[in-house]
Amino acid sequence: MRKNKVLIGLFFCIALTVIFLKKIVNVIINIKWFREVGYLSVYLKRFTSVISLFILVFLICFVAIKTYCRSIKKNLSKNESFIDVDIESKSKGKKIINALTLIISLFIALNFSLGYWDKILEFMNSSKFNVKDPIFNMDISFFIFKLPLIESIYNSLLSLLILLAVITVIVYMFLNIKDRVTLGHKIDRNFININNFKSGITKFAGKQLAILGALLLLCISVGYLIKAWNLSYSPRGVAFGASYTDTKITLKFYIAISIVSIISSIIVAFSILKSKVKPIISCVILIAVLVISERVVSGAWQMLVVKSNERRLETPFIEYNMKYTKKAFGIANVKEQLYPLTNVLNKKSLENNKETINNIKINSVGQALEFYNQVESKKNYYIFNDIDIDRYKINGKYNQVFIAPREIDYEKLQEKANTWQNKHLTYTHGYGVVMSKVNSVTAEGKPDFVIKDMPLVNTSGVEIKDPRIYYGEKTNEYAIVNTKLNEMDYLKDSGENATKNYDGDSGIKMSFINRILFAINKGDMKFLLSSDITSDSRILMNRNIVNRVKKIAPFLKYDNNPYIVINNGKLYWVIDAYTVSNAYPFSEPIGDINYMRNSVKVIIDAVNGTTNFYIIDKNDPIISTYSKIFPGLFKNESEIKEGFREHFKYPQDYFAIQCKAMERYHVKNSGTFFSGQNVWDVAKTQKDIDGKKSVNEASYLIMKLPGEKNEEMILLQYFNQYQRENMIALFGARMDNSNYGNLVLYKFPTTKSETVNSPILFKQKIKQDTTISKELSLWDAKGSQVQFGDTMIIPIDNSLLYVEPLYLRADSERSIPEMKRVIVAYGDKLILAENIEKALSQLFDYDKKNDAKEEVILNKKESVPDELKDAKELYEKAIEAQKQGNWAEYGENIKRLGDILNKLNHPK
């Protein structure tokens, strides 16, 4: 018998090991990976916190439930004359109760530890906001870090108490009915006698129910105290947060209900012990009356008193809402100034703002990305996932540029090439970046590259020593490096592959034990069977940079647009990280949050995957709390290496939230807010001539702000009056040097009757211009599709300069959009020209007084035969076809080039 028990126990141990083997292996691999990236303490903190909390909660639940059951068992023993339970039933019941106690305790402990470990750590390590809420005079940290945990524990405890009370009554009724049936009592209307029931339940579990009843009422008391604190998030009034009715009526009722519940808990406990029902009913009725009265009285008060005097009574609460919303979204210190439009822009003004003019963006992100992917991807498995906008010194000159990393898209590998070896051992990394100026295009209207091709052709003056990208936005597969196979680096002009094996220092070594672990973890025996993997091989895991940072610090929110940076000859990724909350008192929610800070910049090495978290907003209490919980995770801003700061950008995701808040919260007067007279909308735009309207995306521009001496990069958004298309303000975020994060708002005077054109009105003006409209119609008639680029509205010397690039796309499947014209507008003038220089020249009469020499030069340029232009274009197309291995197209272009040259040599 003992031998059988041992075998059964051994069988269960083996079965459990097999069932949980993968989870155990996952934990081991996580430990190895976190150690390798330098954040083992972060993982162990989370892991040990969950385990410790699980054990603690399990023991508390198990002991509490076990003690509760034992106390009922004692009552059963004392009252066997009333409830007869045979020995066999006792034995079975004991096993069932033990099993249920174990299961319930495990379930509660598991859910609580996984759901609340972080809240408990936040509670214990909370940092003060040093801002108090206006109703309870408590620091905001209580609402952010402590109230959520209190509320969660309250809900869990209330559910547990109700469950125990219900189970107690059900068990008693079951045993009572079972005994009465066993004794042969008839089942009729007198089967359950209320007096016998009261007496029996008191003997069976009187003390237990008394304690449960008292605890339930104490829970209700705490619940109404929590409801009182939650009035800080009340939606009842004109503005979010506690209203006049909430503070004068509802709050008082909640406090009264809380006090009555405490007193009732004592009365109910004694009443249960004395088998008296009336006091219990009286307490329940009193609490119910108070609950119903609160709803009736507060509703009547709101309708009869507040509605007729709403502006006066709600003014303090509107002011609270305005103050706390601005604080919560970081818009409390916006530098605001009036921007009167004098429209006195001239040639001298443009010369004084030369860098602004030179950096006007005539390339657009969407069209440029399409061109990058068709021309610069080189092979079908390369992809440019996104274009980033940044500023670099191009050959010593401050320039805004487009920059995009060339990554491998494993989904685009040909079916036959999509093997395990290719995906994980050969195609291990992307290659380099392409960079083009935003302010210029080629003669054909294509991006003006300063970095391109493979190997890199770099005329930018920005050095890149190591162009490989092992960690990126599209690197969703693990890579095994330093194997017997060579890693594909880039495609040579000859069509052969250049190879370059990994020379970084990251990755987990593929020892025999580790190969076994990864075979189990990935469910793939190739880790063990592959002869290409050696003991010197390394596995690079979690290479998707967004997934990587989420694995290390999942409690932060991350920007949707990581961007690549060249620094000291290497490639790095920068990701903006946010702290958010939905528990900031009186702050109007935007989506599901009502507090947000861009507190952290994450910098990731594209080759080694080294990931560093830098705190850039040390005044954020949430990030301060996390840094206490996870010492060693975050680094100080002073530790950021030289060369990164000049590429930090104010993030668009954060700015978009702030713009949404500014639509209503730019006002300073509560009366204006109440009347809703000065509400704004983020401006809308159109991408196609007859396309649908869409919300304008804030643009990164290099410009000189009013009153400033130098140009800088600004994130700029345009605001319209609510549900109208005339522009009312410009809102910008600065990001260069010490000005990072400073917000500026330029308001146009509203007293004048003149309309300030928004992006939509500007586009309508373009379509209404007869000259431009004819030109656009002519292009459409020739089978070309006309597309708008990104609209730019640039403030210069109390004037607005409007710029709109126009793209032409041939009506064919694989056509590439080319920037063919630029529309520039100032005041009532609207100019369509081949480039920005010509447009400005016509707009401000640059060249009316120029001498004849310049005119002759221009005429000579214009007299270049069309055949030479065609020859140049055919030559470039032939070279491009050669690089892509398209020899048929190459031959056709060379033949046509020869025909043109013959024609030039033998003119008629």
Curated annotation (Swiss-Prot):
Membrane topology (UniProt): Multi-pass membrane protein
Record lineage: Bacteria, Bacillati, Bacillota, Clostridia, Eubacteriales
Signal sequence bounds: none
Cross-referenced InterPro entries: UPF0182 (IPR005372)
Family: Belongs to the UPF0182 family.
Ranges annotated as spanning the membrane: 8-28, 47-67, 96-116, 157-177, 209-229, 253-273, 280-300
Superkingdom as given in the UniProt entry: Bacteria
Location(s) in or outside the cell: Cell membrane
Protein name: UPF0182 protein NT01CX_0852
Disulfide bond sites: none
Entry GO CC: extracellular region; plasma membrane
Keywords from the UniProt entry: Cell membrane, Membrane, Transmembrane, Transmembrane helix
